[in-house]
Amino acid sequence: MRGPALLLALRALCALSALRGTARAVNNSGRWWGIINVASSTNLLTDSGSVQLVLEPGLQLLSRKQRRLIRQNPGILHSVSAGLQSAVRECQWQFRNRRWNCPTSQGPNIFGKIVNRGCRETAFIFAITSAGVTHSVARSCSEGSIESCTCDYRRRGPGGPDWHWGGCSDNIDFGRLFGREFVDSSEKGRDLRFLMNLHNNEAGRMTVFSEMRQECKCHGMSGSCTVRTCWMRLPTFRAVGDVLKDRFDGASRVIYGNKGSNRASRVELHHLEPENPAHKPPSPHDLVYFEKSPNFCTYSGKMGTAGTAGRACNSSSPGLDGCELLCCGRGFRTRTQRVTERCNCTFHWCCHVSCLNCTNTQVLHECL
């Protein structure tokens, strides 16, 4: 009896250790998100003629490779932080009417425990934050904010019968390369979660790339536009968020695939396969997940869900923002509040605007 009991205890201990190790690995994969609170606009400090890295508290959350990348690209820290801030705002906008509305908190793991799960929401978080870094860095290059990159000047010469390449194209290639080196370096291991995170990181970057658009400026007598100068411009980040939100809704559930044990092609051995064999394998643009999402209806410290109690809902909507769905069938309360706003504004020449104060009564519905 003692032998089997000891064996079971050892197995349980090993399982617990593995779970703890997984939790640490998951938390580390998103530690760099903590730099969102880095306030400085530069990562450089000149001291006695030498350039040194500012020891911001948030930088302690970065890996050695990430700190090296920041050091090698003066000015890029602000771009990374700005890109992450854009990603958070976009995430909260896209999910503002959902049970999970992309809540954030102070601290290194700004998205909370939901990133410990392999669900759709985690997939979107990784994709949108990766896209945010790529988008912000590419734009900063063309703005001259980063010392190690400039506009993309590779497109030069004739582009068509009535236009040619010129101007300052946003440097999407530098943005993608830096984003891959910086963001992906926080992922460790070869398990399903590792593959999922890397796939969604790349999907975010590819979305920024695929949404690039050509812009042109006309030249000619009296605006005749006989010749046009064109360049490549980044999409708005709202456009990136819209595309990723559509891919969130159509995300592919995957399992861990293994092609064999050929050491010569070890990188290709581990891959993602659709859970349903009848489905097509996910494309590089698709978001992937491997775990069903919680219902997000109630608070759970273990799951990292805040619940929907107290959330504002639309009593007349049959959609996801409606009280029936958002409140998970628990019902809702109705209250009124008086709001004073500026109204009936008039412009007086020159240059003054006068307004009245109007008080309105608003009807609010909140989930129980």
Swiss-Prot record:
One Pfam family linked to the record: wnt
Signal peptide: 1-25
Record flagged with keyword Secreted: yes
A GO molecular function held by the record: signaling receptor binding
Resulting phenotype, C91A: Accumulates in the ER
Result after altering S222A: Accumulates in the ER. Loss of palmitoleoylation
InterPro entries per record: Wnt, Wnt1, Wnt_C, Wnt_CS
Outcome after substituting S222T: Decreases palmitoleoylation by PORCN. No effect on the activation of the canonical Wnt signaling pathway
Keywords (A to Z) from UniProt: Developmental protein, Disulfide bond, Extracellular matrix, Lipoprotein, Secreted, Signal, Wnt signaling pathway
Any one biological process term the GO annotation gives: apoptotic process
Domain of life: Eukaryota
Subcellular location: Secreted, Extracellular space, Extracellular matrix; Secreted
Coiled-coil region list: none
Post-translational modification as stated in the protein's UniProt record: N-glycosylated. N-glycosylation favors subsequent palmitoleoylation.
Gene Ontology CC terms, in alphabetical order: extracellular region
Major site of localization recorded for this protein: secreted
Lipidation (O-palmitoleoyl serine): S222
Cysteine pairings via disulfide bonds: C91-C102, C141-C149, C151-C168, C216-C230, C218-C225, C297-C328, C313-C323, C327-C367, C343-C358, C345-C355, C350-C351
Membrane-spanning segments: none
Function: Ligand for members of the frizzled family of seven transmembrane receptors. Acts in the canonical Wnt signaling pathway by promoting beta-catenin-dependent transcriptional activation. Developmental protein that promotes cell proliferation in the developing spinal cord. Has a role in osteoblast function, bone development and bone homeostasis.
Similarity comment: family membership: Belongs to the Wnt family.
Complexes and interactors: Forms a soluble 1:1 complex with AFM; this prevents oligomerization and is required for prolonged biological activity. The complex with AFM may represent the physiological form in body fluids. Interacts with PORCN.
Name of the protein in its database record: Protein Wnt-1
Top-level taxonomy: Eukaryota, Metazoa, Chordata, Craniata, Vertebrata
